[in-house]
Amino acid sequence: MKRIAVLTSGGDAPGMNAAIRAVVRQAISEGMEVFGIYDGYAGMVAGEIHPLDAASVGDIISRGGTFLHSARYPEFAQLEGQLKGIEQLKKHGIEGVVVIGGDGSYHGAMRLTEHGFPAIGLPGTIDNDIVGTDFTIGFDTAVTTAMDAIDKIRDTSSSHRRTFVIEVMGRNAGDIALWAGIATGADEIIIPEAGFKMEDIVASIKAGYECGKKHNIIVLAEGVMSAAEFGQKLKEAGDTSDLRVTELGHIQRGGSPTARDRVLASRMGTHAVKLLKEGIGGVAVGIRNEKMVENPILGTAEEGALFSLTAEGKIVVNNPHKADIELSSLNKSLS
């Protein structure tokens, strides 16, 4: 394989630039030409395919977002869209593609491989909801951003003896809420994978203030409901505390990636090029126990929920490549 391309698709994630940089520099070291596909699959169909060199990716390892830009392009799920994209790949002599994104991006990579263009998927999403990898590119940065914001909110919450419901991102997965909640000593962590009773939370808030607590921090995954709706339900269930709600929003998708995300992205990008060099396609790169691994894209893109909660309070990880997480009481005070 002499000529490959790289694209980013779907929602952006800190560390994508580091992954692109690794792909480009490893490809050059392997004697390959590398092209950047701008604007994801939409750019592929439109022919926005341009050569990249070492200088193209200089000084981007510390930058958030993706300099190749990203876009959602549902039309690529249809055969017509796929054939248009393949026509452009052939026109530019592309023999393999590295796709950085989430599960929707993986479906596109799977289609490319089926049409004879080996594609490698790299898990680029802050949600950490990709099967077959312990961590995704961008997750660590998103958790760190959420942690920093929650720490600041705790300060003002304590000053005014307030209850805060803080909504974090994650789509249908509760990973960001779980990690950020534990890291900040949140009083409650509400995630889609675990049930909760509103009256129990109200009782916990009341008991906390009665014993002298100066604040109450509830970290809520967006996949459960919005912070505004959750706050309203708290009041309907009898909460009388001074309540505020905050949605952290897209701040979690931006910013300079952490060292962990930069290194993870660099390792994954390098590994992807080595696989393409060997003519391997149709796989997604992951990390398990700090080692690079590959999983079939088909299974990776089509698995269901990553973990669920048993009646005993144990989180069972449906993804066999993630370690079980033991929490004695997920929705009790962790502070």
Curated annotation (Swiss-Prot):
GO biological process: canonical glycolysis; fructose 1,6-bisphosphate metabolic process; fructose 6-phosphate metabolic process
Subcellular location, principal: cytoplasm
The keyword Kinase is assigned to this record: yes
Gene Ontology annotations for the cellular component aspect, listed alphabetically: 6-phosphofructokinase complex
Binding, Mg(2+): 103
Subcellular location as annotated: Cytoplasm
Binding-site residues for ADP, renumbered to this chain: 21-25, 154, 185-187, 213-215
Protein activity control: Allosterically activated by ADP and other diphosphonucleosides, and allosterically inhibited by phosphoenolpyruvate.
GO MF term set: 6-phosphofructokinase activity; AMP binding; ATP binding; fructose-6-phosphate binding; identical protein binding; metal ion binding; monosaccharide binding
Alphabetized NCBIfam families for the sequence: PFKA_ATP, PRK03202.1
Family: Belongs to the phosphofructokinase type A (PFKA) family. ATP-dependent PFK group I subfamily. Prokaryotic clade 'B1' sub-subfamily.
Protein name per UniProt: ATP-dependent 6-phosphofructokinase
Species for this entry: Streptococcus pneumoniae (strain CGSP14)
